[in-house]
A protein has these predicted regions:
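Acidic, proline/glycine-rich low-complexity IDRs
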Residues: 83, 87-93
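Acidic, low-complexity, intrinsically disordered interaction modules
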Residues: 17-85
Length: 95
């Protein structure tokens, strides 16, 4: 049974929320906790165990930032093709 985009988003969102426990103690030298908005580190909220830490010193998002905002900002500079490719990667990995 094919999942729709809303269900996929909810799965990603839930996984992202669950991942916070793994990384909540990471702080930069100035004490700020960061998450990245890049594909390489953020992995669309999919954690590949501890190795896929969500951190990036150049990010302006805190871990309390709204997921939808982070997702929208992350993909806004990508082409429709790239966003579709990411969506397919998520579907292939999860469903």
């Amino acid at each position: 049974m094919e999942k729709n985009i809303k269900e996929i988003k909810e799965t990603i969102k839930a996984d992202f929320v669950n991942s916070r426990a793994v990384i909540k103690n990471y702080e930069t030298p100035d004490g700020t906790i960061y998450m990245t908005k890049t594909i390489e580190h953020f992995n669309i909220g999919i954690m590949d165990n501890y190795g896929a830490l969500i951190w990036a010193n150049d990010s302006n998002y805190s871990l309390t930032e709204d997921f939808e905002t982070a997702w929208s900002d992350m993909v806004k500079n990508y082409s429709d093709y790239e966003v579709e490719r990411l969506r397919k990667e998520i579907e292939n990995k999860w469903f």
